[in-house]
Amino acid sequence: MKRYILAVLVSVFFLTSLQAQQIASYSQYMHDHYLINPAAAGATETMPITLGYKKVWTGFQGSPEFYSLSGNTKINETMGVGAKVFSYKTGYESKFGMDLSYAYAIKIGEANKLAFGLSASLYQFSIDKSQISLEDPNDNTVMYATDKLIVPDANFGTYFTGKNYYVGITVAQLFGRKVNMMNTDYLEQRQVRHYYFHGGYKYEINEDYSVEPSLLLKFIEAGEMQAELNVKGTFKNIAWAGISYRLNDAVIPMFGIEMEKFLFGYAYDITLSDMKTYSQGSHELIFIYKLGSVSSAASL
């Protein structure tokens, strides 16, 4: 029984990830596609610097908390680069990571581009043993656990853009590396591959209003699949609001402001899954500052 309880505790980060994914992601990903696709590095006419924060399942002790800082820019008309650092904490476990990305784009026709991107990743997993309480204080399983573990990985993506639309595919955690913090076979975990498909279309109603529906599909090799539908409306390129539906998981209203050089957004995940009994929802903030020139294509 003792081992079973410990296994559950140690695996909280990973087992909740089968629902919320091992790779934490934002509900407002549509504002910066580089957050989920390395091939989007350099896809806009600006250099967006994106700062994000998300608190998942508010009111639930030890619930996940996620921070990230990223930036990407084009080098020329065919090449782009990007970088991202993030921290993800769940209970007594934490995951710190960094990505370096390179993208190469091929122009197709007058307004279309097809880009391929690759990012090298480095993750550091940590356990705070002082927060672990056991029925038997002499249990050596925790004593011999690894405090920190560094795991390399990689991500690959493709990204096709047109005048008012985009489609992308990402394969994350390509290597599927093992993560064995407790140095025991029965608690060993693995970084499973994640597959993302995302697409959207921006429709200009008139000079003041535009609507952008989008779709994000996520598939994890462990067997979990998730679909997310979003509709975002913008008024005079100043204020925006939207709503997402994550299948069998959450409804997500969101809103914010978007000026020439910056964007601010807030999203609230209203939990629909069994976690709603314990959770008071999830809060998310995102801030984007755009360096360099600004063009209408930057929104894509």
How should each PLM-predicted stretch be described?
Residues 1-4, 108-110:
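Positively charged n-region of N-terminal signal peptides that target proteins for export
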Residues 2-5, 22-24:
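Short, basic/polar N-terminal leader/transit segment immediately after the initiator methionine
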Residues 4-16:
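Sec-dependent N-terminal signal peptides
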Residues 21-300:
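Subset of outer-membrane beta-barrel
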